[in-house]
Amino acid sequence: MKFKQDFFTQLPEFYSQVYPQGISNPHWLAWSDDAAALIGLHQPTDELLQGLSGNAAVEGASYYAQVYSGHQFGGYTPRLGDGRSIILGEAIGPNGAWDVALKGGGPTPYSRHGDGRAVMRSAVREFLVSEALHHLGVPTTRALAVIGSDMPVWRESQETAAITVRLARSHIRFGHFEFFSHSERGQADKLTQLLNFTLKQHYPHLSCDPAGYKAWFLQVVQDSAKMIAHWQAIGFAHGVMNTDNMSILGDSFDFGPFAFLDTFQEDFICNHSDPDGRYAFGQQPGIGLWNLQRLAQALTPVIASDDLIAALNQYQHALVQHYLALMRAKLGLVQQADSSAEQDQQDLELIGRFTVLMEKNQLDYSHTWRRFGQLDPSSLHSSLRDDFIDLNEFDAWYQVYQARLGKVTDVEAWQQQCNRVNPKYILRNYLAQEAIIAVDEGNLAQLQRLHQVLRQPFTEQIEHEELAKRPPDWGQGLIMSCSS
């Protein structure tokens, strides 16, 4: 790997230098060829294993943990920071630079009495979801590898330590701006310094002046709306949408107790530590705006309030337009470039009625959408109909849907188009759990197989048909904890 060290050299007050503490008996548990190509790597090597496990120095790496704050479950925490993630620097790839971070690399000044370690189960989950989301077309950070060990760590019980090697276009979070805005640290010069760095690194077309800042914040609003629209369309619940888990670039970030929907449930809670459902699936769009409002509040020393408010007022429109585009594609609808506000509202109602029907009939979210690839839209009797209990309600919906769809001249091409946007394979929690159990028993085959299948989520893979099945009773709607 070849590194540049722009964050390290230009923002010395935004991190602490800290070196990883190695893990015993490191070994590869997972590796992503796709992610490796982003930074010019090919095959995993012993030298790379020693470096990324913290047991040897990586040439050109600087090693640091970033400091930030954030709103966690609605309450402000003035000092957070990377408690178990150590960044090596920005690795230069063929199409840009990516931060390389060792998640679970050992304690840092921000560990808050924690051990700085990650356990194998959380490392495997983060690896799988990072790569799964990418191949589903969702903006996300990436995962290069998981490195296992025989080092014991204690959570609810004894587990083994592991490291996820994360790649990110940037690790700058909403919480970075909050840290230097609130309390005694509130200094406009630090905010301006961070903002200018962000623009030069990631928005070089924008100028470092009030006009550029205004345009930048609007872009953050739009990118965040796009990310959350993808989550809602694909049926993904993040679980911990704290402001310190929000990427400034609109990439899905910092995965913990996430879940993809099994049975559709608007108020589904995937996080055992969220009994009130603040971050429930259906709450994510509203929380996205709330988090952006907190970012705007932190930016008031450097961006005019009127400009911040004007950008925030664009959030709902951006979210709806991205969501409509994704859901129209799932329904096989043709989207006119100049669709009217009236048509948008009618389509939102059509989509909303269908998801309500799914919830009332307790249907599997991904399976139901995938069925559109088998549908003959010209038929008066939908093959979907048999999945529903309330047939009158479904028939009424289907009649409106057919009218909106219009005549389909090439049914096979239409079905193929539906299959290109409605995945056959998703990372259900029970599949991840089965892979984790197998890894714990020393068997990597199940993890490797699941990873490979999730690289082609829209493609029929007959030999892996069982990975597309609905979850067994024990795996339905699994709720995970934040323990990692």
Swiss-Prot record:
EC numbers, comma separated: 2.7.7.-, 2.7.7.108
List of residues binding Mg(2+): N245, D254
Top-rank lineage group of the source organism: Bacteria
Pfam families: SelO
Coiled-coil blocks: none
Annotated InterPro entries: SelO
Any one GO MF annotation of this record: AMPylase activity
Residues involved in ATP binding: G81, G83, R84, K103, D115, G116, R166, R173, D254
Cofactor(s) needed for function: Mg(2+); Mn(2+)
Keywords: ATP-binding, Magnesium, Manganese, Metal-binding, Nucleotide-binding, Nucleotidyltransferase, Transferase
Cysteines joined through disulfide linkages: none
Active site: D244
Catalysis: reaction(s): L-seryl-[protein] + ATP = 3-O-(5'-adenylyl)-L-seryl-[protein] + diphosphate; L-threonyl-[protein] + ATP = 3-O-(5'-adenylyl)-L-threonyl-[protein] + diphosphate; L-tyrosyl-[protein] + ATP = O-(5'-adenylyl)-L-tyrosyl-[protein] + diphosphate; L-histidyl-[protein] + UTP = N(tele)-(5'-uridylyl)-L-histidyl-[protein] + diphosphate
Biological function: Nucleotidyltransferase involved in the post-translational modification of proteins. It can catalyze the addition of adenosine monophosphate (AMP) or uridine monophosphate (UMP) to a protein, resulting in modifications known as AMPylation and UMPylation.
Membership in a protein family: Belongs to the SELO family.
Protein name stated in the entry: Protein nucleotidyltransferase YdiU
Provenance organism: Shewanella oneidensis (strain ATCC 700550 / JCM 31522 / CIP 106686 / LMG 19005 / NCIMB 14063 / MR-1)
Taxonomic lineage: Bacteria, Pseudomonadati, Pseudomonadota, Gammaproteobacteria, Alteromonadales
